[in-house]
Amino acid sequence: MTAPGLPLLRAPNLAVPHAFTTRAGGVSAGPYAGLNLDDRSDDPRPVAENRARLAAALGFAADDFARLNQVHGVQVVHAQAPGFWEGDALVTATPGVLLAIGTADCYPLLLADPEAGVIGAAHAGWKGTVGRIGQRTVEQMVNLGARPERIHAAVGPGICGEQYEVGEDVAAQFRAAGLGEWVLEREGRTHLDLAGANRALLEGAGVGDLWVSGRCSTEADFYSYRRDAGQTGRMWAVIGLPRREGQTGEARA
């Protein structure tokens, strides 16, 4: 396993190990070609290699990931060790755990309070955005000792508003949640600006420092569920606290 020159996107305001992946640098083939990190449809062998490459690029091992069966809900999981849970956000204060969120149009949110040693990661589709998954993640980070004004947050690549057409039923739920400012009307069609909505929600939660990638998942560099009619891979957004000197692997969940 090697990870030479693995192309990863980094947020300039996050001072802990982290990355937003693209589809470049991996070994998957076919519609998943590249750095696909989801093994539900792809051959699990190249996916395992892709995950190992990503972990190595950040100084972690392939079994350090804390992952989720994401269900477009608002459950925030406190991951005290690597493992696999159901939910749509993760928080931890445990060094050596690499939080991972999978996306292919939904927005990944990465958060860190380096002073407190607390990090978080969230999956924000339209349902999670309406449910304020970013704010809920901040709240759980505060429970672990973080302070909102010290949190640095990054909004990674996702489907841009110009490409994200939705039905009136979805737009109505956005408006009912107080997010009508991010419902866009384009030539008689309705779109959502998920990046703008999540940025505003994180600001409303008191987050002191925000960065937005501005990249759209429908670009060729990324996997996109909508662009590829569902037959596609997944990027991961990952964030971790480095192990302390002399620390070995934690017990597995």
From Swiss-Prot:
Q: Pfam families in the record, alphabetically?
A: Cu-oxidase_4
Which residues bind Zn(2+) per the record?
72, 106, 123
EC number(s) stated in the UniProt entry for this protein: 2.4.2.1, 3.5.4.4, 2.4.2.28
The cofactors required by this protein are: Cu(2+); Zn(2+)
Annotated catalysed reactions: adenosine + phosphate = alpha-D-ribose 1-phosphate + adenine; S-methyl-5'-thioadenosine + phosphate = 5-(methylsulfanyl)-alpha-D-ribose 1-phosphate + adenine; inosine + phosphate = alpha-D-ribose 1-phosphate + hypoxanthine; adenosine + H2O + H(+) = inosine + NH4(+)
Which N-terminal residues, if any, form the signal peptide?
A: none
Q: Which cysteines in this chain are paired by disulphide bridges?
A: none
State the oligomer form and interacting partners. Homodimer.
- Give the family, as the similarity comment puts it: Belongs to the purine nucleoside phosphorylase YfiH/LACC1 family.
Give the protein's biological function. Answer: Purine nucleoside enzyme that catalyzes the phosphorolysis of adenosine and inosine nucleosides, yielding D-ribose 1-phosphate and the respective free bases, adenine and hypoxanthine. Also catalyzes the phosphorolysis of S-methyl-5'-thioadenosine into adenine and S-methyl-5-thio-alpha-D-ribose 1-phosphate. Also has adenosine deaminase activity.
Q: What's the protein name?
A: Purine nucleoside phosphorylase DR_1966
Q: Which organism is it from?
A: Deinococcus radiodurans (strain ATCC 13939 / DSM 20539 / JCM 16871 / CCUG 27074 / LMG 4051 / NBRC 15346 / NCIMB 9279 / VKM B-1422 / R1)
- Read off the lineage from the record: Bacteria, Thermotogati, Deinococcota, Deinococci, Deinococcales
